[in-house]
UniProtKB/Swiss-Prot annotation:
Belongs to the universal ribosomal protein uL3 family. The keyword Amino-acid biosynthesis does not apply. It comes from Bacillus licheniformis (strain ATCC 14580 / DSM 13 / JCM 2505 / CCUG 7422 / NBRC 12200 / NCIMB 9375 / NCTC 10341 / NRRL NRS-1264 / Gibson 46). NCBIfam families: L3_bact (TIGR03625). This is Large ribosomal subunit protein uL3. SUPFAM superfamilies: Translation proteins.
Length: 209
């Protein structure tokens, strides 16, 4: 069954394994999430739990939000997400979900919003090769063919300059190096998408090795 928790990316550091290997890790702070709602097949057409993370001030919440979280006897939340494929019997409305649902060595998928890079060219955005930089080439960092005379148009799917980043990205099969239940921290091997302090979702791996 799927397990999951919402957290905030703190940054990267490194730890040593027992054999002395240096492991780069991303620190994720996952303060206790609260189960706000259980969705059932009878009422909603599918099964899922809705969890909330990070309290926000009462005056910033509207009336429907306040009424929704009142059923779970908790404060309004900044971030609310649904998790599907979970063991519905293991959760109740108002229950706290903590980092100790995971264990050391477990494989997870981490989803976040990538850093926005603004308007970028085809080389940086799509990883294309540049043209020769020598004198007289007249083709250095351009996107490439825009369609010859016969089609008289640019083909669909042509990789062009545009806004880069700011998209939802999921990195799969990352190993949890350490679970610090006292400080609500997860240390995940490698890097995860997003800037510091950005929201990330940690879930059981879909394609675990």
């Amino acid at each position: 069954m799927t397990k999951g928790i919402l957290g905030r990316k703190i940054g990267m550091t490194q730890v040593f394994a027992e054999n002395g290997d240096l492991i780069p890790v991303t620190v994720i702070e996952a303060a206790p999430n609260v189960v706000l709602q259980k969705k059932t097949s009878e009422n909603d057409g599918y099964e899922a739990i809705q969890i909330g993370f990070d309290d926000k001030r009462e005056k910033l919440a509207n009336k429907p939000e306040k009424g929704h979280v009142a059923k779970a006897e908790t404060a309004p939340k900044r971030f609310v997400k649904e998790l599907r494929g979970v063991d519905m019997d293991a959760y109740e409305v108002g229950q706290e979900v903590k980092v100790d649902i995971f264990s050391n060595g477990e494989i997870v998928d981490v989803t976040g919003t990538s850093k926005g890079k603004g308007f970028q060219g085809a080389i940086k955005r799509h990883g294309q090769s540049r043209g020769p930089m020598s004198h007289g080439s007249r083709y250095h960092r351009r996107p490439g063919s825009m369609g010859p005379v016969d089609p008289n148009r640019v083909f669909k799917g042509k990789l062009l300059p545009g806004r880069m980043g700011g998209e939802q990205i999921t990195v799969q099969n990352l190993e949890i190096v350490k679970v610090d239940a006292e400080r609500n921290l997860l240390l995940v091997k490698g890097n995860v998408p997003g800037a510091k302090k950005s929201l990330v979702t940690v879930k059981s791996a879909v394609k675990s090795k």
